[in-house]
Regions:
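Membrane-embedded alpha-helical signal segments
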Residues: 1-302, 316, 320, 440-481
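Amphipathic alpha-helical protein-protein interaction surfaces
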Residues: 165, 331, 424-425
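Transmembrane alpha-helical segments that form the functional core of multipass membrane systems
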Residues: 254, 267-415
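Hydrophobic alpha-helical transmembrane segments of membrane transport and translocation systems
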Residues: 386-388, 392-481
Length: 481
């Protein structure tokens, strides 16, 4: 680790060797109390207007009040005067080495270097341009806050602090060991979060070495290093209100600079079917919506497989009138029912991916054209049957009821359809048992993934919010019935 030199020229030479070719590197030589100095920063990351008004103006006003015998003569004396005997808004911790200097500068801060002093004064005059606080498009709600996380870490931390106005909220910031040196934050409530879990997360993130860090989800392989896992015991949110609610339950929230997505851990399976609106409506209606979401999730996984199993292996269980229509539709298509269902499922995923990755102005058009023209043309040409299109459409709509489970639901739907088409009822039962085994085998930090999923007072069917508030809940203790 290269320590700062007492020579201003050596420090500037070291910075010029690293950033001299960069157009945004800014180094301004100044003189304070007849002592040579320099202000170093990155243009457009630090606000020059704030810098001059706060730093130099304050130093100039302080000069006439000094007696001649107290006038500083060396860089160390100037540093002590500015740090301890002036109104300059300097950070408490000075810069002592080159790595720390670069870290502060890349965070949008300005650093004052003085000749004859091995320390640098740091000023928080960030002027970073970023996306404003907006409503997240992926998490809709009818009531409650409309704010969403921004891209800057400090802005996101302030949004959480504004909601949780207690001394129990702790926000630890650190720098990731990656090429980008991205800053991240670990947030938790010290009176609710498990101390062992917090220490484990802190240690894991310190030891993690991602090549790049662009989002909080990049930490998941280090936090839960299982090679094959369909369900991850974590959740994501872009709403400060949701993150604050999770913090009050004793959970840990991880934020990464440059990403509006917050990683929440540990997470339960039943929480994929909750939303903020559940607690703003009556218990009866929110319970109905939760039952609807559970049904939609299992429908999105098993409906194509059950349809293939019944139509191919157990046609006697289908009502005769419906069976005759399915058989008539299948006679007009060249593919067997099993292959036809797989083709439609894959085709719907292609359409979804195209609509998602296309520019927003074209994405809706692509989805509409694919749904109307391609689907109608496929049926008219006899490539696909109407019952298969209907089943696949119901499945595609059902999976969007629980968007946080879209990835595992898509893979499980393909797996269940393959098992039902190749092995019939036996394959369908084995696939269902496999899904159940996958869910029951997951735990995060000692908390089972299915903890309290069905029989909790805030599970599939919940009590009214007044009754829930009588028993404060944290993730580390199961709320009794």
């Amino acid at each position: 680790m290269l320590q700062l030199s007492s020579s201003l020229e050596e420090n500037l030479a070291a910075l010029n060797a690293r950033f001299g070719a960069s157009a945004d590197f800014y180094a301004k030589r100044i003189e304070l109390y007849h002592c040579p100095g320099a202000i170093v920063l990155f243009d457009n990351m630090a606000s020059l207007q704030s810098l001059w008004s706060l730093l130099l103006d304050a130093a100039t006003r302080h000069t006439p009040s000094l007696e001649p015998e107290r006038m500083p003569h060396t860089g160390t004396q100037v540093y002590d005067l500015l740090m301890n005997h002036s109104g300059l808004p300097a950070e408490d911790s000075p810069v002592k080495d080159m790595d720390d200097l670069i870290r502060r500068m890349t965070a949008g801060m300005a650093v004052l270097l003085l000749d004859g002093c091995k320390k640098g004064l740091v000023f928080s005059v960030q002027g970073l341009k970023s996306r404003s606080v907006e409503e997240p498009s992926g998490e809709g709600n009818l009531r409650g806050s409309r704010e969403g996380f921004a891209d800057l870490l400090r802005v996101n931390l302030s949004l959480l602090r504004r909601l949780i106005r207690t001394d129990t909220l702790v926000m630890e910031t650190a720098q990731a060991d990656c090429a980008m040196k991205t800053e991240y934050a670990i947030c938790y409530c010290k009176d609710k979060a498990g101390k062992t879990a917090v220490a484990r997360v802190r240690r894991t993130l310190q030891e993690a070495k991602p090549e790049v860090l662009l989002d909080s989800s990049y930490f998941v392989p280090w936090l839960f290093p299982a090679r094959w896992r369909l369900f991850a015991p974590v959740s994501y949110t872009e709403r400060p209100a949701s993150a604050a609610a999770k913090l009050c339950e004793g959970k840990i929230v991880i934020l990464v600079n440059g990403s509006p997505s917050a990683l929440v851990l540990p997470s339960l399976f039943c929480e994929n079917f909750d939303c903020l609106d559940d607690y703003a409506t009556t218990a009866v209606f929110s319970s109905f919506l939760r039952v609807l979401k559970y049904g939609s999730f299992y429908l999105s996984i098993f409906l194509p497989g059950v349809f293939v199993c019944l139509a191919v292996y157990l046609p006697e269980l289908i009502p005769p009138q419906l069976l005759f229509k399915i058989a008539a539709a299948e006679k007009a298509t060249p593919l067997p029912l099993f292959a036809e269902m797989l083709l439609v499922i894959i085709l719907l995923e292609i359409i979804r991916e195209a609509g998602l990755r296309m520019p927003q102005t074209l994405g809706h058009s692509v989805s509409l054209v694919a749904a109307l023209i391609i689907g109608d043309a496929a049926i008219g040409a006899g490539l696909l049957s109407t019952p298969v299109i209907l089943v696949a459409s119901i499945t595609a709509i059902s999976v969007f009821v629980t968007p946080s489970l879209y990835e595992p639901a898509t893979l499980l739907r393909l797996g269940v359809t393959l098992a039902a088409g190749l092995a019939g009822p036996v394959g369908l039962v084995c696939a269902a048992l496999g899904v159940l085994a996958a869910l029951t085998s997951i735990s995060a930090m000692g908390v089972p993934y299915l903890s309290g999923a069905a029989f909790s007072v805030d599970g599939v069917v919940r009590r009214n919010y007044r009754a829930l508030s009588r028993r404060p809940f944290t993730i580390w203790q199961r709320r009794g019935s």
